[in-house]
Amino acid sequence: MARQKFERTKPHINIGTIGHVDHGKTTLTAAITMALAATGNSKAKRYEDIDSAPEEKARGITINTAHVEYETKNRHYAHVDCPGHADYVKNMITGAAQMDGAILVVSAADGPMPQTKEHILLAKQVGVPNIVVFLNKEDQVDDSELLELVELEIRETLSNYEFPGDDIPVIPGSALLSVEALTKNPKITKGENKWVDKILNLMDQVDSYIPTPTRDTEKDFLMAIEDVLSITGRGTVATGRVERGTIKVGETVELVGLKDTRSTTITGLEMFQKSLDEALAGDNVGVLLRGIQKNDVERGMVLAKPRTINPHTKFDSQVYILTKEEGGRHTPFFEGYRPQFYVRTTDVTGKIESFRSDNDNPAQMVMPGDRIKMKVELIQPIAIEKGMRFAIREGGRTVGAGVVLSIIQ
């Protein structure tokens, strides 16, 4: 059977459910697919289908994530849901599932819980730009004043983590009662069941409140170099995948990282042995560089639009350290530890200068399984920017994953 072609007729958005364990994230994911299936815009997925999330690897870390897709009238969504709390932490730090927005699920019966706060904090740190709240289990709260108090508490919590708590849409409802209604009658239309209507209302809010993101092709050009070849009579070719932006033959780019930044002109572009006029984000290309010798270029450098990225050696980061069971270290480590930091296409040795916990208290050591903030100094400058992901490796195996919070130097 021929594979279906992916038709791009609507804007595409990546979204996910976040929140405390047992507050109803997976049930809500099922309810959304079922409610939208009833409107003819998606395929229904049962709770069991979503909950048995397959394992996937991102930056050497195994994560369980369920991916579902659905459509509203205006948009196509790819939705991620993780079964376990550790999976969320790993997912968000590794950027395995980049989110343009998130639906924060909070049980109206419990209000914000420790993991609710941890997920909001993580969303802020790793750059999830927008959150919409689903106040689940509304049917378990008889008192409307109590419901208002929980909503206020959620808004306050979001504001504490620098999200616009006063403006964020908060939609009460019951994922379970929606799923039950849709299981009995999969063809329910708007106006026939109040619980299903609340799910449709949630998706209307997601449609309007979460903006369509700037796509990678519209950003400043950047390509991490994976390999360098010398072609007799033509010059030096750098190969790699265009991470963002677009590039045309004749444009000027900078070579950034590991050595002094140099400027060069692109004299040719090739993909699958054919020459191109222009390369776009996602393309694997060979780039012919004018006036550059093979030994001027090495794996780990980047080609970028001039003055859009700089080489740095010191940064602050949020990291997750793998447990022994996940293939990580068996013992704690201390300040001064010198692992390799794998950034884009290369390993660079770095020294961990200091650790702090979420509330910025100093920490003495880091145990396998910890999530911690750390300041790092690399022995060589490389192209780094806020929000960039990296892996921490030791002797070729991954022992942690991180995201850059800020550049120090």
From Swiss-Prot:
This protein's GO CC annotations: chloroplast; mitochondrion
Binding sites annotated in the UniProt record for GTP: 19-26, 81-85, 136-139
Ranges where the record places region G3: 81-84
Signal peptide annotation: none
Region (G4): 136-139
Biological process annotations from GO: mitochondrial translational elongation
Record bears the keyword Protein biosynthesis: yes
Keywords in alphabetical order: Chloroplast, Elongation factor, GTP-binding, Hydrolase, Magnesium, Metal-binding, Methylation, Nucleotide-binding, Plastid, Protein biosynthesis
Binding site for Mg(2+): 26
Region (G2): 60-64
Positions of region (G5): 174-176
GO molecular function terms listed in the Swiss-Prot or TrEMBL record: GTP binding; GTPase activity; translation elongation factor activity
Region feature G1, mapped onto this chain: 19-26
InterPro entries, alphabetized: EF-Tu_GTP-bd, EF-Tu_GTPase, EFTu-like_2, EFTU_2, G_TR_CS, P-loop_NTPase, Small_GTP-bd, T_Tr_GTP-bd_dom
EC number of this enzyme: 3.6.5.3
Domain tr-type G residue range list: 10-214
Catalytic activity: GTP + H2O = GDP + phosphate + H(+)
Cell location: Plastid, Chloroplast
Family: Belongs to the TRAFAC class translation factor GTPase superfamily. Classic translation factor GTPase family. EF-Tu/EF-1A subfamily.
The protein, known as: Elongation factor Tu, chloroplastic
Lineage, opening ranks: Eukaryota, Discoba, Euglenozoa, Euglenida, Spirocuta
Primary gene name: tufA
